[in-house]
């Protein structure tokens, strides 16, 4: 039966039911069927849940406790699926299709889509009404049967009206967008989710809120050893996850009921962004001492959070822009490094919205101001978090041609090359990403070659997606090519890493294949460092059976043919000292 016919049938049954009730005014009422209205509100995180799954849970309203995310994940922001690490906080990034989490399947019953998984649906109530109507029309039915039928009819009508006219369920916060630390606990012991404000990528490739990461660093300071080399690199902060942050912002714009303005950081007396007095107060505070300036910066940050619907604020408060850009020059007598850190954080947070990004990218003085910030940071000891934020700002705003050109003209490539010398994973990763953004459309090729960026990338003693992409795209001098040949074993190990986790994902693996192809074509003898060549060739065959771009497919086939000819299988078996089950090559 089509929906219109079913609705007409329900209306007829309701009219007949009303007439039947009028003829039986002496019958007593029975208790109505109760509905669980808890499903009308966003579901809390399951008790005992600590790590987010990689996509919205498709489970009943009371899912069992989860300890680890599933092994599948979407390829987002430089990560791909694998089992969760053993620490309790991190969670894999969500895929772009998960920004619409919480919507019901196309053919799902509306009642169940609203969260009432255990209650009657519209079809259930229609069946109850038909049964009661049949009992009314039965001339042989006893009085008790008619009384029971009247009660069933009333229950069905009440339930049907509730399903039809009740208030819509507020949007559920996708688990991937929820903060991991701190997580408040409700009176019933369940965990309450809040929108993740500042997602960062951990070295493992998992994303958490920066608040959680900072707490973990205070409790367990540690250093990292590069995945494919033996060099230890200290971590200051993790890498900002711009893509996940954009996804959260877009989701919040569509679901303003759960925007960050509803979280605990919102002041008890909200600002009135429409009042000019608030902006004038901020500008006045900037002319005071360090404490006043810090308060002004916090007020600006609140403006980015308390605007209804998480709307971008720079379009409304244009007077803030020159203050943020020129603040240190105007009030340098009372300026401190902590204030500089807060200013960079605010600018980076403002880039969350495309409208803000476009406004910032259009500022003529921003490129020069960024270069001065880096120079001052170098004079004061190179605070790594400041440098990483600067590189992150450059990477984000370089999507606009006007900013990219100004940054290159201001010496941005040389500035970012200098950051590659700092032995800090966050700074190196962000600097490589920014260089890749400046290199868009080949505009930065000449500055990159002039400042020997490829050589500096190889001296970082680490590989990430950004570094591998740059080494693949940038022109290589004979000296750089020799250094790449020296890294042949590390490149092979990257390709052999089947889980594609950590700092190198599938995108980086494809770039590693291109670099290996160049080595094989120009000097196949350098591949002699690979002891178990059969395993590597088998891995290449496995990759060739997957869906690869045509160019990569041809490169893989050429590598297999050349290596098979240069290193016949019997010779390889004679040289190999590795166990037959070994996958990583050494």
Swiss-Prot record:
U-box domain mapped to chain residues: 182-258
SUPFAM superfamilies per record: ARM repeat, RING/U-box
GO biological process assignments: protein ubiquitination
Signal peptide: none
Pfam families attached to this UniProt entry: U-box
Pathway of action: Protein modification; protein ubiquitination
Catalytic activity: S-ubiquitinyl-[E2 ubiquitin-conjugating enzyme]-L-cysteine + [acceptor protein]-L-lysine = [E2 ubiquitin-conjugating enzyme]-L-cysteine + N(6)-ubiquitinyl-[acceptor protein]-L-lysine
Described function: Possesses E3 ubiquitin-protein ligase in vitro.
Protein name, as recorded: U-box domain-containing protein 73
